[in-house]
Regions:
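Structural motif
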Residues: 13-15, 48-51, 154-156, 196-199, ...
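A generic structural signal for short, non-catalytic loop/turn and secondary-structure boundary residues
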Residues: 9-10, 192-193, 292, 326-328, ...
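A conserved active-site cap/scaffold subdomain adjacent to cofactor or substrate pockets
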Residues: 268-344
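Glycine-centered loop/turn motif at secondary-structure junctions
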Residues: 45, 152, 195, 232-235, ...
């Protein structure tokens, strides 16, 4: 039987709003916009919201550099990072709260420094997770609590001790545990019932025995989606992922002079493929949780919130090609087919990498069987090339490549898309073509220097690409 408290809030709408690093610039120009959006959400919902915050732009990379310097015994100072928090506090925290906020910032700096002092030759594991979050998301969410209270909003920050995102102990790429996290819902529900909004650190998790973890790059998306999922039994949750620009048919900086279209709706599959191939809409683990719990996601541009995009299981859009993405920094690795199985298993199972794809095997004129893999992150290969040669000392890597991808679930029922795309780039050398419209993507591998030109040329044909196929009279395609 449901408890009274469960029934009381069962139909209340609760928004979980994530504000990423691009909105938390080091000068604080995005903070008034964030405050404005939180006010709008409160006015609309009457409850919450839960506001998930990333670290300020550039802070995570700066903290990684500082941590690695301590591993080399030439430790860089934390001052440049914490000066950002001091500056934001002076700009946006008022009265007595300013002194309290500055004391909290100093405490986070001391905790971060103590953690760095424990670095011994390697900046990794729990020490890395603790450093990045103490100096990043935990400090930022605390500061945003003070900023919001200074602007007349009742808020609270979730402490490390009560943190409701419980994870495994894969410290640098942790996976949330649904059942264990559900047991800590009071960290959300209690302040929400008291009429407060909740400031939550993104990217951060904690093991059942209290050790700090991080959720991997883009982990703040996962924090917001996961929080929405574990609260679905108590609230009608909405997940709002605030960005600086709307989701568009292509990057306007790449297709200069062309009109881009606002992408109003994407399926989970389309969003996953677009993000993996360079669009960075929502990170893959967050999409996986949303799909599992059928949780719609709204990607909201903070300056034009009416230009939001909805990501859900299915949508009624008639577009064949939703968007085009371009990604540089790719490579093709070629190795013995016989040795490729253990190589692939090692990367997928032990390294937990899914940013590469099998291009298939071919038989050379020598009779040797070679298998090729497309890697979307050539830096990983450069850093680990010697180690990877342990699988095949004769493996070869072609660097300097990029990928251009056409995204759309409806391509599987629309012949001719690939030929139109290829016809648009007759002057560009296609290194490889992965024509798999049944997977909602057509991938063209080109030289890195040609990525932008390829995207621009194909985008010019987008209207033509989205015309339904003109079948001959009386002809029906096979289903």
């Amino acid at each position: 039987m449901l408890s009274h408290s469960r029934v009381e809030c069962a139909f209340k709408t609760l928004s979980v709003a994530k504000f990423g690093g691009s909105l938390l610039d080091v000068e604080g120009k995005g903070i008034p916009k964030i405050i404005g959006q939180i006010r709008e959400i409160q006015k609309r919902d009457g409850t919450g919201p839960i506001a998930v915050f990333s670290a300020p732009m550039g802070c995570t990379d700066a903290l990684i550099k500082i941590g690695e310097s301590h591993a080399q015994e030439c430790g860089l100072s934390l001052d440049p990072v914490f000066e950002i928090y001091d500056r934001l506090a002076k700009l946006y925290v008022k009265g007595e709260l300013l002194k309290q906020a500055q004391e909290e910032i100093a405490n986070y700096k001391a905790l971060t420094q103590t953690t760095l002092d424990a670095v011994n030759k390697r900046f990794s594991g729990n020490i890395k997770a603790r450093t990045l979050t103490l100096g990043g998301e935990l400090c930022m969410s605390m500061l945003m609590d003070y900023i919001l209270r200074s602007h007349g909003l009742e808020s609270c920050a979730v402490s490390m001790e009560n943190f409701p995102v419980v994870t495994d102990d894969n410290f640098e790429d942790a996976a949330p545990n649904y059942e264990l996290s559900k047991k800590r819902l009071d960290a959300f529900v209690k302040p929400l019932k008291e009429g407060k909004l909740v400031c939550l650190a993104g990217f951060f998790g904690i093991t059942p025995d209290g050790l700090e973890t991080i959720l991997g790059r883009g982990g703040s998306d996962l924090t917001a989606v996961f929080a929405s999922c574990i609260l679905k039994d108590s609230y009608q949750t909405k997940t709002l992922l605030y960005k600086d620009v709307p989701v568009q048919s292509a990057d306007p900086k790449v297709v200069r002079g062309q009109k881009t279209d606002h992408v109003k709706a994407l399926t989970y599959n389309e969003a996953h493929k677009a993000s993996l191939m360079g669009m960075k809409i929502v990170m893959s683990p967050a999409i996986a949780w949303a799909r599992r719990f059928n949780q719609p996601l709204m990607v909201v541009p903070i300056d034009e919130p009416e230009m939001f995009s909805v990501i859900e299981a299915q949508n009624s859009s008639g577009e064949i090609v939703k968007c085009l993405t371009g990604k540089s920094g790719c490579a093709i690795l070629s190795m013995s087919d016989e040795k490729s199985r253990s190589f692939e298993d090692s990367l997928r199972i032990w390294e937990r990498r899914n940013d590469f794809m099998d291009l298939g095997a071919e038989t050379m004129e020598t009779g040797e069987h070679i298998r090729d893999f497309l890697f979307l992150d050539s830096e990983f290969l450069k850093k680990n090339e010697e180690r990877l040669k342990g699988f095949d000392e004769n493996l070869k890597i072609e660097y300097g490549l990029g990928v251009v991808t056409l995204i759309g679930d409806k391509m599987k029922d629309s012949p001719g898309v690939a030929s139109l795309a290829i016809g648009a780039i007759s002057g560009i050398n296609i290194k490889r073509g992965i024509f798999a419209p049944h997977t909602s993507q057509i991938i063209l591998v080109v030289e890195e220097k040609n990525v932008a030109a390829t995207v621009a040329a194909i985008h010019l044909k987008k209207q033509e690409l989205n015309k339904p196929p003109a079948w001959p009279i009386g002809f029906q395609p096979l289903k």
